[in-house]
Amino acid sequence: MARVKRGNVARKRRNKILRLARGFQGSNGSLFRTANQRVMKALCNAYRDRRRRKRDFRRLWIARINAAARINGVSYSRLIGGLKKADVRINRKMLAQLAVMDPKSFTSVVTSAKS
């Protein structure tokens, strides 16, 4: 069997990793071994944090809605329960936007949930 020289393939693989590691500090962006470790870690963190971001934003929306609801004299859980009973189909993201950008219309939503 003929000998296989891996020059082009190996260089392409290493350059791909070094391209992904561009901007990393020190040897993490310039030496293949350390860059490979940093890139693998970065990709793992990115995968995990894409899922975590969804949770974090939902927590932020709930905190904002709760704060605005308490200003209007109702707790978050009672507000959400009231909205479900009143058949108001508005999600937490939109409620949080209303609470921050347009408090008057948020107050009208709260009054519809109270009744």
From Swiss-Prot:
MF terms from GO for this chain are: rRNA binding; structural constituent of ribosome
Q: Name one GO cellular component term.
A: ribosome
Which terms are listed as keywords in the entry?
A: Ribonucleoprotein, Ribosomal protein, RNA-binding, rRNA-binding
Question: Organism's domain of life?
Answer: Bacteria
- Tell me which Gene Ontology terms the entry assigns under biological process: ribosomal large subunit assembly; translation
Q: Could you tell me which Pfam families the record lists for this protein?
A: Ribosomal_L20
Biological function: Binds directly to 23S ribosomal RNA and is necessary for the in vitro assembly process of the 50S ribosomal subunit. It is not involved in the protein synthesizing functions of that subunit.
As for family, the record states: Belongs to the bacterial ribosomal protein bL20 family.
Protein name (database record): Large ribosomal subunit protein bL20
Annotated source species = Prochlorococcus marinus (strain MIT 9313)
* Gene for this chain: rplT
